[in-house]
Amino acid sequence: MTVDAVRVELGARAYEVRIGPGLIARAGAEIAPLLRRPKLAILTDETVAGLHLAPFQAALAEAGIASSALALPAGEATKGWEQFSRAVEWLLEEKVERRDVVVALGGGVIGDLAGFAAAVLRRGVRFVQVPTTLLAQVDSSVGGKTGINTAQGKNLVGAFHQPSLVLADIGVLESLPARDFLAGYGEVVKYGLLGDADFFEWLEGAAPRLASDPEARQRAVRRSVEMKAEIVARDETEEGDRALLNLGHTFCHALEKATGYSDRLLHGEGVAIGCALAFELSQHMGLCPQEAPSRLRAHLRAMGMKVDLRDIPGDLPDAEGLLRLMAQDKKVVDGKLRFILARDIGAAFVAKDVPGDLVRRILQEALATR
């Protein structure tokens, strides 16, 4: 299999997302052209370090690149002030200079945290994303959104800081637990829902074999990255079209906050549930065909994914409580929520005039099934 390269066109800050097998094994050769001196600082987590850090550092050494690494605890709870401060202090202790490169080796949590650390360190150093989860490969590693969570909500502190290179090794996805792979699929299916009905139709047939079929997996990752790259090139800082990438995320972020960013609900699982709720809301507003939400839910169920609020273990707030959590969403403008709704599968749009009473009713009905 060959490596695909998708270019994110951002003028002088353009970069490539390289997608294919074996990229970690030749990471040194891939990254070396970016370096002013043969030295790298790697931020990773303890789980990824046990699986991929040794081969990654061996590939760097083969290219004559020295490296040091800090492994943070795995999990969403790491994406906060404490571990962020620890990472920044470590990078300073390692004497990372402004012309050096930081590597984010891991999933979305590490990519977001390491990217933000690179953004603020010495007022900005370059970084390379080496995403090791499906979710990170198709979404969080591309586009330059970096940041951490706070007590007030998810991703409320951060910066736009584009990577210099993304290496998406699809081979490492074979080591992912099934639940994590399916959670990542929540972001893959989102791309079909928001802007490519043909891709969604292909996924309905191909998705069950993504975990075992490298060619299908690479195609799914490539198409997802292509769609994100096109949108980011048009709207880097989310003033318009880029908000489409948040399909399902208004509901998702509230649910993640309600579950304490714990393993009760992984981010991609929340995205899948959020997409289902967004399509249901669209249908209730008379915007999309009645069969669209049913078709989406049927596909998610066939994949063995979480689909409804009843699939989330443990207690949840009532509808009013969830609405209050939504009010902290980054997409709030002038105190009003913006939702990403859909006219059909593959036809999402930004809506600024969604009736709060209808959102409340959708949530009440979903909670009533628990």
Swiss-Prot record:
**CDD domains named in the record:** DHQS
- Location of this chain's protein in the cell: Cytoplasm
Name the pathway it acts in: Metabolic intermediate biosynthesis; chorismate biosynthesis; chorismate from D-erythrose 4-phosphate and phosphoenolpyruvate: step 2/7
Q: Which residues bind Zn(2+)?
A: E187, H249, H267
GO molecular function term, any single one: nucleotide binding
Predominant cellular place of this UniProt entry's protein: cytoplasm
**Which range is the signal sequence, renumbered to this chain?**
none
Among the entry's GO cellular component annotations, what is one? cytoplasm
Query: Which InterPro entries does the entry mention?
Result: Dehydroquinate_synthase, DHQ_synth_AroB, DHQ_synth_fam, DHQS/DOIS_N, DHQS_C
Q: What is its EC number?
A: 4.2.3.4
Superkingdom of the source species? Bacteria
- Tell me one GO biological process term: amino acid biosynthetic process
Q: Which cofactor does it need?
A: Co(2+); Zn(2+); NAD(+)
Q: How is the cofactor bound?
A: Binds 1 divalent metal cation per subunit. Can use either Co(2+) or Zn(2+).
Q: Which residues bind NAD(+)?
A: G108, V109, I110, G111, D112, T132, T133, K145, K154
Q: Which UniProt keywords apply?
A: Amino-acid biosynthesis, Aromatic amino acid biosynthesis, Cobalt, Cytoplasm, Lyase, Metal-binding, NAD, Nucleotide-binding, Zinc
- Which reactions does this protein catalyse? 7-phospho-2-dehydro-3-deoxy-D-arabino-heptonate = 3-dehydroquinate + phosphate
Role, per record: Catalyzes the conversion of 3-deoxy-D-arabino-heptulosonate 7-phosphate (DAHP) to dehydroquinate (DHQ).
Instruction: Give the family, as the similarity comment puts it.
Output: Belongs to the sugar phosphate cyclases superfamily. Dehydroquinate synthase family.
Protein name in the entry: 3-dehydroquinate synthase
Gene of this entry: aroB
